Amino acid sequence: FGGKDESIMPAFDGLLLYQMLVSGAIGIVVMTFFFTEQSVMYRLLMLAGFVVMSDIWIATIFLSGMKQYKAILNSFAVGYGCTVGFALLLRPFNLEGLLGGFVLGQFILLIGMVILILRNYPSRYFIAFDFAKKKMFFWSLVWVGFFYNFGLWLDKFMFWFYLPTSQPII
C-alpha cells in the first residue's frame, strides 16, 4: 500500500464486500441445485459458513502480511474453541445444530480477526475499491496465489473424488 496505512482498512473492507458478493452468489447457486434434499436451515447455514470461511481466508492473508502470527494463532484458538463449544451446545438439534455451532464459531473467529486489522490500521474511510484499479493489479500475484492455493487443495480433491478414500456423509 505504498506506506499509506490509512488505505489498508478501506481496501480490506472493499475486498471483503466484493468477496462476500461473489461467494454468496456461488453459494446460492450451489445451495439451490445441489442440496435440494437437505432442509432449508441446513442450506442457509452452509451458505453462511461458506461466506464466513471465505472472509476468514481474506482476513488471514491480511494478518499474515502484517506479520501478526501470534494474533492469528490466538484468534483461531478462540474461534475454534467457540466452534467446539457451540457445536456441543447445539448438538441436540442434530446436523443443523452442529453446523450452526460451526458457523457461530467461525463468525467469532472472523470478528476477532477484523478487530485486529482495524486496531492496527484505523482509517477515517470505511470502504474503498483501490485494489480493483488497473495500476494496483499484479498478474504475477494472481498466478502465485492460484498455484499456491491449488497446491494446498489438490490432496483434498484427490481424497474426495477417489472412491476408496471417500464416502457420502449426508
PLM ranges: what are they?
Residues 2-10, 68, 163-169:
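Juxtamembrane helix-boundary/capping and inter-helix hinge elements in multi-pass membrane proteins
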Residues 75-119:
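Hydrophobic alpha-helical transmembrane segments
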